[in-house]
Amino acid sequence: LLLERYLLAFEEASMACITSINISARKGVRKTPVGDAPQVVLVDDGLENDAHAGKWHRQVSFLAEASLARARDMGLEVGPGDFAENFTTKGIDLLDLPLGTQLRLGKDVLVEISQIGKVCHTRCAIYHLAGDCLFPREGIFGVVLHGGVVSAGDAIEVVRRGDGTCTHTPPEALAEVEAARKAGTL
């Protein structure tokens, strides 16, 4: 049984990839999948032409296809980008990645996980439709350490597993998420 679990984990890790890249011109809205078009990721900034790019600790965001499937199980008609994630993924357990984990996207892009989850100060349309929103609990964020070009279908590789800390993230941002998690409000 242990060997089966190991093989399954190995298979999933070897299949880890970006299934969709999504951008938006402004914050607070769903992002639009860009299809197969290669996208430029700028160092210490994020996805070119995306509203969330900038000099802060949440330059890019990730959400697993499994999270979208759970939302669909709740009766929502959602797809890639609908939770405003930049990268929709499969084959990698995003919630198992501690802060500081470094991910290689494609051949060149290097991202460090800077925040797990987020506090929603204003409830989004999805929350009002379903009474819940998965992204605050299941979305993760990163800062871009090395830029480059990525496309849907590119591999995701864990380059270095983090130790649970990230120097790019303000302590108050982490404290806010942790307080909400403990209070059960994420």
Please annotate each region the language model reported.
Residues 89-91, 139-146:
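Short alpha-helix capping/helix-loop boundary micro-motifs
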Residues 131, 146-149:
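Extended, hydrophobic interaction surfaces within ordered domains
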Residues 2, 6-110, 115-118, 149, ...:
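Electropositive, beta-rich accessory/interaction domains or terminal extensions
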Residues 130-134, 159-164:
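Short secondary-structure transition/capping segments
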Residues 76-86, 124-139:
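Short, basic/aromatic beta-hairpin or loop at an interaction surface
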Residues 150-155:
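Short, well-structured beta-strand-loop connectors
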Residues 122-126, 168-169:
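A short, polar/proline- and glycine-enriched secondary-structure boundary/capping micro-motif
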